[in-house]
Regions:
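Glycine-rich, basic loop-to-helix element that forms the pyrophosphate-binding segment
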Residues: 1-3
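Membrane-proximal intracellular helices of multi-pass ion channels
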Residues: 5-256
Length: 256
């Protein structure tokens, strides 16, 4: 699963390891460094969180070795593969929230996984850190991320959030289930989880999939397509590629 997610980065890293044994010195590209570090951090942090969030729930009665293995497995597959060794529907709310985050981040660029990609998440974190330090540019490892790439990353993340919100709203709108309002709160969470899972092309579900009607299934199919191709890719394909070099007078507004 890991090698399938980080194919391009491993393709860059393996020749460097080979050259190191031969006495040659080559450096990893910045992209490969960011992908490997971000992926490893997400897996480790996710596994630790799942372990402590579920040690009194689904991990009760299993050995420590098995519990650790389950935690790492679920942390890895939540961003790409969608396999499951536990019943997702009985996880704690905190674990569900964590899985939503991991599915939103998704896999690495160049893989068949969906989501906003781990490099986008890394750039967003670097942007926040550099701004807090007073840096105008986004710097990492003696390199500067181009401002155009930073702007594209922000656009991808915000467009993804908006699309997820719209699709979730559509699932609720087309719902034909009956019952008390309070009883539908659980269904609301299930729809959100289903939408995030489709966006990340993960395949995890809290069990609501068989109960979706035709219109809701169409929405999920659309979400999977958008998650795989990417919201900005679709936008660029839809609109004209002609650049408009129009600049108006600047005016500030209050924010925050």
């Amino acid at each position: 699963i890991y090698t399938g997610e980080d194919t391009l980065s491993l393709h860059d890293a393996l020749p460097i390891l080979t050259d190191k044994f031969r006495g040659r010195r080559r450096r990893l590209s910045l992209h490969t460094k960011i992908v490997l570090i971000t992926t490893s951090a997400l897996i480790l942090i996710g596994a630790v969180c799942i372990f402590f969030m579920e040690k009194h729930n689904v991990l009760v009665g299993v050995s420590l070795k098995t519990a650790v293995l389950i935690s790492f497995f679920q942390s890895v597959v939540a961003r790409t593969a969608g396999f499951s060794t536990v019943d997702i529907g009985v996880l704690t709310n905190s674990s569900i929230l964590l899985l939503l985050f991991l599915m939103f981040v998704g896999a690495s660029p160049g893989s068949t996984g969906g989501g906003v990609k781990n490099t986008s998440f890394a750039i967003l974190c670097l942007l926040i850190v550099n701004r807090m330090r007073g840096n105008e540019n986004v710097n990492i490892a003696n390199r500067t991320i181009p401002s155009e790439l930073v702007d594209r990353t922000i656009s991808i993340i915000f467009a993804s959030v908006i699309i997820i919100g719209v699709i979730t709203g559509a699932l609720l709108l087309f719902s034909t289930s009956e019952g008390a309002t309070l009883a539908k709160r659980t269904e609301f969470v299930e729809y959100i989880f289903e939408t995030f899972s489709a966006f990340g092309t993960v395949g995890l579900s809290m069990g609501v999939t068989p109960r979706l009607n035709d219109m809701q299934k169409y929405m999920i199919i659309l979400m999977m397509f958008i998650g795989r191709v990417g919201p900005l890719t679709l936008a660029f394909a839809w609109y004209s590629h002609r650049k408009k070099s129009i600049t108006y007078a600047e005016e500030t507004i209050m924010v925050g």
